[in-house]
Amino acid sequence: MNTLNLDIVTPNGSVYNRDNVELVVMQTTAGEIGVMSGHIPTVAALKTGFVKVKFHDGTEYIAVSDGFVEVRKDKVSIIVQTAETAREIDVERAKLAKARAESHLENDDDNTDIHRAERALERANNRLRVAELK
């Protein structure tokens, strides 16, 4: 089976790089997309969600924030603000972030940035979902 290289990049640099990937599944703003070696070149916007990485002897899940994906014949490059494998996610920290975001959303104070709190809640919930996929 032909394989591809997956590289996930954040502002801190490459945080995940793997060769011999058989399938990459991502959530784009237009829906879910699966990519295998030889896929047509594509660029798409990603929404906060997970990346499923299937390789010869297993599957790995990575929580990602909004970003972009570029697909070439044998390479997938994902550019996002944040990315964490399911194993790396600190569940307690994610629960605290969720509680903090929910508290901000419940607060009627005009100083609360509702959009920012909603995004924080979305990211925390995503991290908790992906952590369960270990």
Curated annotation (Swiss-Prot):
What are the transmembrane regions? Answer: none
- Report membrane topology: Peripheral membrane protein
A single GO CC term for this protein reads: proton-transporting ATP synthase complex
Q: Name one GO molecular function term.
A: proton-transporting ATP synthase activity, rotational mechanism
Q: Which UniProt keywords apply?
A: ATP synthesis, Cell membrane, CF(1), Hydrogen ion transport, Ion transport, Membrane, Transport
**Record's keyword annotation contains Membrane:** yes
Homology family: Belongs to the ATPase epsilon chain family.
Job of this protein: Produces ATP from ADP in the presence of a proton gradient across the membrane.
Q: Where in the cell is it found?
A: Cell membrane
- Describe the subunit structure: F-type ATPases have 2 components, CF(1) - the catalytic core - and CF(0) - the membrane proton channel. CF(1) has five subunits: alpha(3), beta(3), gamma(1), delta(1), epsilon(1). CF(0) has three main subunits: a, b and c.
The species is Staphylococcus aureus (strain NCTC 8325 / PS 47)
Signal peptide stretch: none
- Tell me the Pfam families matching this sequence: ATP-synt_DE, ATP-synt_DE_N
One GO-annotated biological process of the protein: proton motive force-driven ATP synthesis
Chief localization: membrane
Q: What is this protein called?
A: ATP synthase epsilon chain
Entry keyword annotation includes Cell membrane: yes
